[in-house]
Amino acid sequence: MKNLSSRRYTLKGTLALAATLIAGPCLAAAHAADYHLLNVSYDPTRELYSDINQAFPAFWSKTNSGDSVVVTSSHGGSGAQARSVLEGAPADVVTLGLAYDIDILAQNGLLATDWQKRLPHNSTPYTSTIVFLVRKGNPKNIHDWPDLIRDGIQVVTPNPKTSGGARWNYLAAWGWALHQPGGTEQSATTYLKALFAHVPVLDTGARGATNSFVQRGLGDVLIAWEDEALLASRDLGPDKFDIVVPPLTILAEPPVATVDRNVQEHGTEAVSRAYLDFLFSPEGQRIGARHYFRPVDPAIQAETAAVFPHTTTFDVASLGGWTRLQKAHFSDGGVFDQIYSH
């Protein structure tokens, strides 16, 4: 149909064109597609991706009129979610808590090993950081990492073997200890051992840990994603909790990727890529900011600057990178297994 104006028509061609025009609406309907995408995500993104999933179909239809898109999301601890995809969960996209969990999928052939180069900011549409959520009025006077190991303080944090957020929490504490004057891996290990002696129970995911703290009343302080702490404070009332941003903490970078093997099987490559592109769009960035994820778009950062307090951060690369850290700390027999005796 695009090149009709350049053709010379015979009577036969004219009749064929007429038939095509009459059938046009039927052909257009036949070419419309129904897409069903599965986003396998980590624990504290339920509300974020509920809104993203509702907004994305309109974004897709701007250039794909007539298509229908339904996106569903699955949530849990990031490590456990990655394992579910390895075991056959039909994810079109993964939006996990840390790059290592997606690297595992790449190492097993589910997507390309250079997946982080496909999208801006190492395929990270939003960032966060690690903060402390405390009871209103901060009755235990918790302001910084050393306060967490004082006598009588109970700390709530999830299990770093199953939760991406827990690994960020752990590494925030580890990195803080390393950055202290004279800090060494030995002194950081000593601090982590003292910290986890104050943890009465390990939930499997960040949302479970939040529920233990805010609903069950367990503990004096929750180590949490900034977005999770802000969400809890907003939804349960600022009269119940305060947020403490430690002077030094970690830059948390939760990345996203298409699962190449699955989207090729499902025929959803283009729509899955567009879904991830939407996260970087101004609309997607604003949705992220509404759910307290720090945007990466400078314009949206400027719009939302008042929401996010300034803090000094270090990143995972400065600690040696995920591959080294995973092996040293979170593999069987690693530092975490050595220090956690419960």
What is the meaning of each model-derived region?
Residues 137-143, 162, 175-183, 262-270:
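Short helix-loop capping/hinge motifs at secondary-structure junctions, enriched
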Residues 7-14:
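N-terminal export leaders
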Residues 40-42, 134-136, 154-181, 195-199, ...:
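Short beta-strand->loop
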Residues 180-247:
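Ligand-binding pocket segment of bilobal, Venus flytrap-like solute-binding proteins
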